[in-house]
């Protein structure tokens, strides 16, 4: 039986909140089978839980947040959620003593290292996948995103940024998903923003944690970060990272092919909700033995250099 995964032990780190610019303590806790992914704000009394759920997602200008029925929110969940998807963590409690997950370096890599440091524990319950049975597509103007049947999880993402720093040949990225592929090819890709937007937000008391340490920053002509890019196509790789995190908001890995053109958090979430709302478009899948499991989802065997 392919089993659900959680952590072996509690791990903790600190970082800076993108919105507040203040120090945030992040604690990752193991959870029992069928708990799912739970985000928890411990700065509130009593603490407030936010189960990962496609319907709770709100897309703001700066990040993805989860909002409960009382309009309480937890922000900047997308990069950690992508790391959970990357390692196939089914059950976890994510605690922060703030309204937001720390931004770290703007990628998912610090979270991958933290999760690997905790270690992965298999639980004695079958891991449940969402298997796509029919194509589902959503559109917004010229932007679109689609999930279609595929025995694995493949991603094909195209961006269309007219900017001197983003070469036309680096605007499409394709990948057959695996924990190793995610860790090596996607997790290190950072979020990006315009200097003018960051300055405008900070003048209004927003994005106070935004800096060269946690994003690729561009002006109208070039990348301003001293060390440049981590990949020549880091921009599109980060959009794929975002999509992996967005699609994991249902708390289950997807078996299917994801294709997108100029999609973002809002459209990715719209696609996930459209799939889940169309009962004939998907089914639950479990696997009795590894031989029948798509190679994509074999247990991660990561040695991170």
UniProtKB/Swiss-Prot annotation:
**Which residues of this protein are catalytic?**
265
- Annotated family: Belongs to the LpxC family.
Q: Which GO terms describe its cellular component?
A: membrane
Required co-factor(s) are: Zn(2+)
* Enzyme kind, highest EC tier: hydrolase
Q: Where does Zn(2+) bind?
A: 79, 238, 242
Q: Which UniProt keywords apply?
A: Hydrolase, Lipid A biosynthesis, Lipid biosynthesis, Lipid metabolism, Metal-binding, Zinc
Q: What is its EC number?
A: 3.5.1.108
Question: Per the record, what are the reactions this protein catalyses?
Answer: a UDP-3-O-[(3R)-3-hydroxyacyl]-N-acetyl-alpha-D-glucosamine + H2O = a UDP-3-O-[(3R)-3-hydroxyacyl]-alpha-D-glucosamine + acetate
Q: What pathway or pathways are given for this protein in its record?
A: Glycolipid biosynthesis; lipid IV(A) biosynthesis; lipid IV(A) from (3R)-3-hydroxytetradecanoyl-[acyl-carrier-protein] and UDP-N-acetyl-alpha-D-glucosamine: step 2/6
Query: What name does UniProt use for this protein?
Result: UDP-3-O-acyl-N-acetylglucosamine deacetylase
**Which InterPro entries does the record cross-reference, listed alphabetically?**
Ribosomal_Su5_D2-typ_SF (IPR020568), UDP-acyl_GlcNac_deAcase (IPR004463), UDP-acyl_GlcNac_deAcase_C (IPR011334), UDP-acyl_N-AcGlcN_deAcase_N (IPR015870)
């Amino acid at each position: 039986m392919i089993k659900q995964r959680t952590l072996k032990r509690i791990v903790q780190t600190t970082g800076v909140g993108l919105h507040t610019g203040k120090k945030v303590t992040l604690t990752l806790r193991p959870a029992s089978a069928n708990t799912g992914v739970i985000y928890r704000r411990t700065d509130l009394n009593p603490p407030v839980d936010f189960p990962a759920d496609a319907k709770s997602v709100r897309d703001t200008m700066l990040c993805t947040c989860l909002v409960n029925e009382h309009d309480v929110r937890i922000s900047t969940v997308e990069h950690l959620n992508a790391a959970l998807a990357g390692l196939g963590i089914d059950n976890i409690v994510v605690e922060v003593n703030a309204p937001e997950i720390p931004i770290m370096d703007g990628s998912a890599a610090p979270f991958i290292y933290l999760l690997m440091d905790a270690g992965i524990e298999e639980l004695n319950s079958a891991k449940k996948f969402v298997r796509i049975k029919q194509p589902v597509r959503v559109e917004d103007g010229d932007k679109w995103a689609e999930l279609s049947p595929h025995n694995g999880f493949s991603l094909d993402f195209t961006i269309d940024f007219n900017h001197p720093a983003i070469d036309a040949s680096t605007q499409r990225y394709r990948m057959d998903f695996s924990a190793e592929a995610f860790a090596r090819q996607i997790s290190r890709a950072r979020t990006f923003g315009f200097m003018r937007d960051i300055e405008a937000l900070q003048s209004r008391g927003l994005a106070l944690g935004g800096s060269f340490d946690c994003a690729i920053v561009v002006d109208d002509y070039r990348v301003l970060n001293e060390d440049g890019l981590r990949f020549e196509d880091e921009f599109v790789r980060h959009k794929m990272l975002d999509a992996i995190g967005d699609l994991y908001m249902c708390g289950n890995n997807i078996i299917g092919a994801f294709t997108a053109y100029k999609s973002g958090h809002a459209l990715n979430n719209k696609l996930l909700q459209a799939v889940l709302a169309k009962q004939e478009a998907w089914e639950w899948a479990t696997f009795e033995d590894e031989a029948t499991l798509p190679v994509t989802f074999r247990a991660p065997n990561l040695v991170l250099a």
